[in-house]
């Protein structure tokens, strides 16, 4: 039911090239906010895409996690 409403489970992480450790870190810094149901996290597809963009910035430019998240937020404002 959640998948039909636009929320994706942690199993979708691999489709977006995201590790569980990276997702936990993005949640910890407040870059994304999961929906928690029964102890499981669910994310909107747009949040998974935001994290994937930040991860590409980290890998391609050598930015740290907070810096990559900040770049994504700045790009979204333009």
UniProtKB/Swiss-Prot annotation:
Modification comment: The N-terminus is blocked.
Protein's UniProt keywords contain Chaperone: yes
Recorded superkingdom: Bacteria
Keywords: Chaperone, Stress response
A Pfam short name: MerR_2
InterPro entries recorded: DNA-bd_dom_put_sf (IPR009061)
Subunit structure: Forms a heterononamer with DnaK and DnaJ. Three copies of each protein are present in the complex.
Chain's role: Required for correct assembly of the DnaK-DnaJ complex in the resting state. Seems to stabilize this ternary complex until it is replaced by substrate proteins under heat-shock conditions.
Protein name: Protein DafA
Lineage of the species this protein comes from: Bacteria, Thermotogati, Deinococcota, Deinococci, Thermales
